[in-house]
């Protein structure tokens, strides 16, 4: 009925992989009422994983007043290769959640972000405002433990030596090109991003109390602070780039 909620149970295949979408949506008449909160509750299952979407959209025709809880959980991200047809750079069990709110498509925020990938945990929030002179991103993230080892290919000692020998045989000893860097991309967006990690693990190095702040505005990129504890010593650095015309 036009005034009744809509139940969904859709099954289909993609790349010979079965997928299923179940749940319910608000009544069809609510789609045309910009003052009515249009509810939706969906579960998408595939390759042993599930994606959950629950909440409402106040004005669905103009996509305004979005308030959705998002979650995804599964045994191995690598299983999604069956759907994409391409191998993913990240493998292992995952559990992801977030809260999407958007007054309009030009201004949205994902808060209460919680990401669990293997032994790594990341929390934070990110917001995008496209009403400014240029798109502005504001993001804050924190990780108690970020284990990069499953995502970084570890080269053997022989391959590293071979690479070093190739560099020695190079005719030029220049580290940087004499040509100016093309920094025009710095004008595309403004951003304020911060990331803190209690511990970051690599194959041959471990960083403690890592902190980085990135501020990009009007083509000027400032990375400050950039601090960490490595091998028992403290490291502090900063970087500033300014995009200019020729």
Language-model-detected regions and their locations in the chain:
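Gly/lys/ser-thr-rich phosphate-binding loops in alpha/beta enzymes
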Residues: 113
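Membrane-proximal interfacial segments on either side of biological membranes
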Residues: 1-97, 101-109, 118-224, 229-246
